[in-house]
C-alpha cells in the first residue's frame, strides 16, 4: 500500500526520527535548475522566496548561500520546521530565515494575504498533496497564485510527467528540466522527474 503522504499524522511520525531527507533529487541538483531564474529576479530586486513543504530538506541553506535571507519555509508539521532550523544553524551558526507552520493547501489561512513572493518552490510537495486528489492540488495552486508578486513564478519538481494537467489551473505550465531517475540495472528504461515552471495565466 502507498504511504499516506497526504496525512499530517504520517509526517508527524516520520519527522519524529528523520533529521534530513531529499525528495527526488539533491538540493544541489534542484538549485542548479532554479539558479538562472533566481539570478534574473535578483538583477531587479532582492528575492522573496517561499518554499512549500520544506520538510527535512536543506534547500533553504542553498538559498542562504546565494545571499537570499528573505526565505519563508512552510510546512504543516512543526517537527519539520524544527529540523529546518537545526539544519540552518548547523550550516551558518544562526537562524535568519523564517519557518512558518501552515498547510500548503490553505496558504491564505497560514500567511497574511498581502505577503507576496517573487519565487515559490517545492520539491515534490505537489506529489504528496496530489495523493488527496485534484481538488487539494488546485487549492494549493490557487494559494500560490494569491501569494505571488507581480512577475513572480513557481518552480516545482515532481515525479509525474503530467502533474499539472488540470482544468482551472491558474498557471501556464512549462517543463524546464528533466532529471533522470536512478537505475537498478543498466538495461532499465530511462525515466525522468519533471521540473515545472508555472507562471500565472491571464484567465
Regions found by a protein language model. Give the residues of each.
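Class I S-adenosyl-L-methionine
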Residues: 163-203
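A short SAM/SAH-binding and catalytic strip from SAM-dependent methyltransferases
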Residues: 118-134
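Class I SAM-dependent methyltransferase SAM/SAH-binding core
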Residues: 50, 55-107
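Conserved beta-strand signature within the Rossmann-like core of class I S-adenosyl-L-methionine
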Residues: 151-158
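Conserved alpha-helix/loop element of class I SAM-dependent methyltransferases that forms part
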Residues: 24-45
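A short acidic, Gly/Pro-enriched loop at the edge of an enzyme's catalytic core
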Residues: 105, 109-120
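A short glycine-rich, Lys/Arg-flanked "PGG" loop and its adjoining helix->strand segment in the class I
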Residues: 135-150
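N-terminal, positively charged/glycine-rich alpha-helical extensions of SAM-dependent methyltransferases
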Residues: 1-20, 25-28
